[in-house]
């Protein structure tokens, strides 16, 4: 009796929605990112699930606010994931 789903080659969308420990290859949902300030254009490294308010080193503007999950970036700030 064949399975309805291929367990060795899961669909990417299904793999993303799956719990981090039940994936084929386990990996966390969190990451570090470079955030560029919209005022002084300095780059700061921020954790994606930061639990404190992160301010810019150069101009003391707020870069991100903590939520119960991922940190919410301030409008105008751009970011990229670190590898």
Curated annotation (Swiss-Prot):
Necessary cofactors: Zn(2+)
Pfam families, per database record: Ribosomal_S27e (PF01667)
Cofactor binding description: Binds 1 zinc ion per subunit.
GO BP of this protein: ribosomal small subunit assembly; translation
InterPro entries xrefs: Ribosomal_eS27, Ribosomal_eS27_Zn-bd_dom_sf, Ribosomal_zn-bd
Cellular component annotations (GO), alphabetically ordered: cytosolic small ribosomal subunit
Keywords carried by this UniProt record: Metal-binding, Ribonucleoprotein, Ribosomal protein, Zinc, Zinc-finger
Domain of life (superkingdom): Eukaryota
Mapped zinc finger ranges (C4-type): 37-59
A GO term, aspect molecular function: RNA binding
Family: Belongs to the eukaryotic ribosomal protein eS27 family.
Protein's name in the database: Small ribosomal subunit protein eS27
